[in-house]
Amino acid sequence: MKTILLLSALFAFPTFYVNQDTEADRLLGVWEPSNGKARVKIEKIGNKYYGKIVWLKEPNDPATNQPKVDAKNPDASVRNVPLKGYRMLKDFTYSGSSQWENGTIYDPENGSTYKCVIKMTDANTLDIRGYIGIEALGRTDVWKRLEVKK
C-alpha cells in the first residue's frame, strides 16, 4: 500500500508543475495596448515573463525621420536606445488564478517605471495595472491579443 501511495505521489507531483506552466504560458503572444500605438510580444525567459515592443504605429520621430528612441528615460545613458525592441514589461511571475505579479512596466511616454500586475480576463484580454505604492492607487489598461486564441 505504501508503495502505491508513493508512486501515485511521484507521478502526480510533476503533473502539477507541468499544468501550472501551461496555464502560466497563456500569457505568451503579441498584445496591443488600448491606445493602439504599439504591440508588445510577451516572452518567457527562465521562469519569468517579459514584454518587448515589436511594432510602433509611428516608428520614426517626425522631427528627425529616425527611429523613435527612449528620450524620456531618466537614465541618460539609454536615451538613444530605439523604442522598438525595448523591454517594457519585466520580471513577472505567475501567481495562479490567471494573474502575473512582482513585475514592472515602463511607460516610454513619461519615462517612468511602475510596479505592475497582469490579470487575464479571458484568453484574448489582459488587464494591465501599473501603480506606485499600493495597487489600489494605480491605473488599468486593457490589452488585446493579436493572435486570437479560441
Task: Give the location of each predicted region.
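Central antiparallel beta-sheet cores of small beta-barrel/beta-sandwich binding domains
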Residues: 28, 43-107, 113-115
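Short, surface-exposed coil-to-beta transition loops
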Residues: 36-39, 87, 111-115, 129, ...
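Well-ordered beta-strand positions
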Residues: 32, 41-43, 93, 119-120, ...
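Residue-level recognition of beta-strand termini and adjacent short loop/turns
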Residues: 96, 122-124
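A mature extracytoplasmic/lumenal domain signature
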Residues: 35, 44-46, 53-55, 107, ...
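Tryptophan-anchored aromatic micro-motifs
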Residues: 23-38, 53, 102-103, 143-144
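Edge beta-strand at a domain terminus
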Residues: 125, 132-150
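Bacterial Sec-dependent N-terminal signal peptides
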Residues: 1-22
